[in-house]
């Protein structure tokens, strides 16, 4: 390993040190910081939902996105497009590409809000710039209808 490689490896280890301390020194238990998981068993759903809401209140864009997905899901008995829209907007403001893609799609289809092709196009272009792969195609589709 050359000098640059050693310096990079040392830098990575120094960055991981606080996470290793939280895991009690067990490198296999490094916590996923600020994440929430809603794909749990039904009996654990309320607890998982509460954890996600707490993370979202703390500004975790991924938690906001996950909550948006949860409330957007057509198979969810708790489906709420207004809640989904709100969480997607919060994550979108932090540059979360998939939240921007979902938000743009909701504006385009008029889900939870009146359809607005101009707003959809702008948000979808932002999503494409931030890395959402399908956003550019959807933005082109919106542009054809403007």
What residue spans do the PLM features occupy?
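Bacterial N-terminal signal peptides that target proteins for export
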Residues: 1-9
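Bacterial N-terminal signal peptides
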Residues: 9-18
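N-terminal leader/linker segments that initiate helical-solenoid repeat arrays
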Residues: 20-51
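Hydrophobic face of amphipathic alpha-helices that form TPR/SEL1-like repeat modules
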Residues: 30-39, 66-73, 102-109, 140-145
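Short helix-capping/linker turns of helical repeat alpha-solenoids
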Residues: 39, 57-60, 73-75, 93-96, ...
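Structural signature of tandem alpha-helical TPR/SEL1-like repeats
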Residues: 41-50, 78-87, 114-123
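Canonical positions in the second alpha-helix
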Residues: 53-55, 90-91, 127
């Amino acid at each position: 390993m050359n000098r640059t490689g050693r310096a990079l490896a040392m830098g990575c280890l120094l960055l991981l040190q606080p996470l290793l301390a939280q895991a009690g020194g067990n490198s296999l238990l490094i916590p996923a910081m600020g994440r929430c998981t809603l794909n749990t068993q039904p009996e654990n759903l309320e607890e998982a939902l509460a954890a996600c809401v707490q993370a979202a209140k703390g500004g975790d864009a991924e938690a906001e996105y996950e909550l948006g997905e949860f409330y957007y899901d057509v198979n969810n008995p708790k489906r709420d497009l207004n809640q989904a829209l709100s969480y997607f907007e919060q994550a979108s403001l932090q540059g979360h590409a998939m939240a921007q893609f979902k938000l743009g799609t909701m504006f385009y289809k008029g889900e939870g809000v009146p359809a607005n092709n101009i707003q959809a196009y702008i948000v979808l272009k932002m999503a494409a710039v931030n890395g959402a792969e399908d956003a550019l195609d959807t933005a082109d589709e919106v542009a054809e209808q403007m």
